[in-house]
């Protein structure tokens, strides 16, 4: 049986701020920004080249929901990715080489954390 990860919900305290961070800072594509009713708002964004998306919004999680930690984005060139994100205003840690696999870390405005990962060549 095949399974594919489709959607990762991320808690946020400010949907517009998070949407700006992911769309303008990280370069994610805004797939949907809808208000289906009952005070809900759903914003789905997808990293370039990914088939898995994130979703942020209003009425989707408790305000005090735990933050998501250490989501990985695999990139071909971590130095280039780090440079592009830094130029877009995203604070990214220095690159660490962990035995051929390289990592750099960042967090969104709500404290959800991410790792850029370049696999060993």
Language model features with spans:
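Generic preference for hydrophobic
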Residues: 45, 56-58, 116
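Short, charged/polar, Gly/Pro-enriched secondary-structure boundary elements
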Residues: 50-54, 111-114
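Vicinal oxygen chelate
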Residues: 3, 7, 31-34, 41-42, ...
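Eukaryotic phosphotyrosine signaling hubs
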Residues: 5-7, 68-71
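Short amphipathic alpha-helices within nucleic acid-binding modules
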Residues: 21, 79-84
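Core segments of cupin and vicinal oxygen chelate
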Residues: 2-3, 9-52, 87
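Short, charged/polar surface micro-motifs in flexible loops or helix N-caps
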Residues: 48-52, 62-64, 77-80
